């Protein structure tokens, strides 16, 4: 009797395993987009846009960041798209379409490392932070191995394709990433350009205050960046989870 029960259990178990195996074969295999990177996570040549927001102040203002350097401001009735272009060796390159882009996120900071054969062996690094007390953000560009090439960074800010966003994500209604994109023919396009210093630190800063994009003296912009980084670092180190 016991042997009969054991045989029955074995047969049922084998059938169930077969069913699970067949079911698993029919499931679409998914590849992880992001991978652990220190206390953050990163991806290489990702395609997700406006999926990681940076918050600073207590207002609803936020900066949406992407797997590549294209950004958007979320501010009720005042949304903006922000993108950058590098001009080097007589050519212009949209930073969101370079050949190699590693994007990393850690505790309120988004970082990018970019390379492109068209501009030689140069490496362009970018990090962006939200301001802690005001509605805005700051970008820090750093250039390496560009030699004596003149590097110009151009920032562009304009309205987003959609002006009024849905606020019902909790019930499944939300706007797709294309809502944050720039329209084909922007009506409120503003362009700001800066030249990468060839003496001293090859760094260049941009800032957006509310919806105004600007650049300025590196010494002043650097202080704003460092203050935002200090605030972020202090906040991040106040609570640490180890798994």
Q: What residues fall within each predicted segment?
A:
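Terminal accessory carbohydrate-recognition/targeting modules of carbohydrate-active enzymes
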Residues: 23-243
């Amino acid at each position: 009797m016991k042997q009969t029960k054991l045989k029955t259990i074995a047969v049922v178990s084998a059938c169930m395993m077969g069913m699970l195996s067949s079911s698993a074969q029919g499931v679409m295999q998914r590849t992880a987009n992001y991978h652990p990177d220190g206390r953050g996570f990163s991806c290489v040549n990702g395609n997700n846009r406006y999926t990681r927001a940076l918050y600073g102040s207590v207002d609803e203002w936020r900066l949406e960041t992407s797997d590549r350097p294209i950004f958007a401001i979320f501010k009720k009735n005042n949304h903006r798209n922000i993108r950058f272009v590098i001009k080097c060796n007589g050519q212009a390159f949209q930073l969101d379409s370079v050949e190699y882009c590693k994007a990393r996120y850690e505790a309120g900071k988004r970082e990018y490392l970019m390379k492109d054969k068209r501009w030689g062996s140069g490496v362009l690094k970018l990090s962006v932070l939200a301001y802690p007390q005001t509605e805005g953000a700051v970008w820090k560009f750093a250039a390496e191995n560009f030699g004596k090439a003149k590097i110009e960074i151009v920032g562009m800010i304009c309205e987003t394709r959609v002006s009024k966003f849905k606020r019902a994500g909790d019930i499944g209604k939300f706007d797709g990433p294309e809502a944050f994109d720039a329209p084909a023919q922007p009506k409120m396009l503003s362009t700001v350009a800066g030249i990468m210093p060839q003496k001293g630190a090859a760094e260049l800063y941009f800032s957006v205050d509310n919806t105004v994009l600007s650049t300025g003296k590196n010494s002043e912009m650097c202080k704003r960046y460092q203050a935002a980084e200090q605030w972020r670092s202090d906040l991040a180190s106040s609570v640490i989870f180890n798994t």
